[in-house]
Regions:
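Generic hydrophobic transmembrane alpha-helix motif, especially the helices
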Residues: 137-173
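C-terminal transmembrane helix and the adjacent membrane-cytosol boundary/short C-terminal tail
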Residues: 183-187, 222-225, 265-308
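Transmembrane-helix boundary motif in ABC transporter permease subunits
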Residues: 106-136, 149, 296-305
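Amphipathic cytosolic juxtamembrane alpha-helices at the membrane-cytosol interface
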Residues: 125-129, 133, 190-222
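Transmembrane alpha-helical segments of polytopic membrane transport and secretion proteins
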Residues: 1-51, 296-308
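Periplasmic/extracellular loop-to-transmembrane helix junction in inner-membrane transport proteins
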Residues: 26-49, 63-106, 262-276
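Transmembrane alpha-helices
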Residues: 107, 181-182, 204-241
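Interhelical loop and adjacent transmembrane-helix boundary motif
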Residues: 85-86, 238-287
Length: 308
């Protein structure tokens, strides 16, 4: 019994041309895809190298300060006041309290101003709002020593060195970060919520307080924390507004010590114990700034995910 084998007919002229074009397009697409994958891989490698090179100085700084400063930490370091030169056993309790007072007062001064200015910027448009944004951007780029000199000329010359003059200088330093951060946070609130609140008959002030501000609280907290992290480590404004003291003081009208002062003065001392105190103060300051920055960035990341 014989079997016949059926063979597929050869493609005609048009079909052959179509098949050839399809094979050509598929080959070109595969080559393009391979090239794009190679480019994407190269870009990822370059970005990874850049990120690694960026993290090297940070890791070296954190490791070096930790190595030099962690040995100074003790109960006495956090509870005692500084001792005279050459006498070991001193601490930075007055500097810790002074930094909390100065930066806390600066935060109290800058927070309402930054919030009100940000509310004005999201409600008003025009040359005045643009000028305020431009001024905030310029102020954020000014060297902190100029802000300290400004506070010295306006406050210290007419009064005396004090904690409140240092707080005013740091508040000016924090303001541009708060203004721009608060504005961006409140812009994440949808316009529909504004319109819904006004349509219900609520006053604009009530809508702002109950809808806009309440809806942007995570972003406002982030902006304030990042501004505080900027002000905590500044030394130049303090040099013009208050003076280093070994006394424990909580008066806003008197000179008050701060952690940057301890780092600046003890770090340049010829005595080893004071140098060790400076490294310990640097470690405490570094940890504090890192904690504030991490908390602020975490809030910012959550706000971004929520807005999406």
């Amino acid at each position: 019994m014989s079997t016949d084998v059926l063979e597929a007919p050869a493609p005609s002229g048009k079909d052959a041309t179509y098949a050839a074009r399809r094979q050509l397009i598929q080959g070109s697409a595969r080559a393009t895809l391979k090239r794009r994958r190679a480019i994407a891989l190269a870009i990822r490698i370059i970005f990874g190298i850049c990120m690694f090179l960026t993290l090297i100085p940070l890791a070296f700084l954190i490791g070096y300060v930790t190595k030099r400063g962690i040995g100074a930490l003790s109960v006495a370091f956090f509870t005692h006041t500084p001792t005279p030169e050459g006498i070991p056993g001193g601490g930075i309790s007055n500097a810790i309290v002074g930094s909390l007072i100065i930066n806390g007062l600066a935060l109290v001064i800058a927070m309402p101003i930054g919030l009100l200015v940000a509310l004005f910027l999201i409600e008003r448009r025009g040359p005045i709002a643009n000028a305020i944004r431009f001024g905030a951007d310029v102020l954020s780029g000014l060297p902190s020593i100029l802000i300290g000199l400004f506070a010295y000329s306006v406050i210290v010359v007419h009064t005396h060195y004090s904690a409140y003059s240092a707080s005013v200088a740091l508040a000016v330093l924090m303001l541009p970060i708060m203004i721009r951060g608060n504005e961006e946070a409140m812009r994440t609130v949808p316009n529909e919520l504004w319109e819904a609140g006004l349509a219900l008959g609520a006053r604009q002030s009530r809508v702002v307080r109950s809808v806009v501000v309440r809806g942007s609280i995570p972003g406002l907290v982030t902006a304030n924390l990042l501004a505080l992290a900027r002000g905590v480590g500044e030394t130049a404004p303090l040099l013009f507004t208050t003076i280093f003291t070994q006394q424990f003081s909580t008066s806003l009208n008197q000179p008050i010590n701060a952690i940057p002062f301890v780092i600046y003065y003890d770090g340049t001392s010829a005595f080893k114990d004071l140098q060790q105190d400076a490294w310990g103060a640097a470690f405490v300051l570094m940890v504090g700034v890192l904690i504030l920055s991490i908390i602020g960035r975490t809030f910012a990341a959550r706000l971004t995910r929520k807005s999406r």
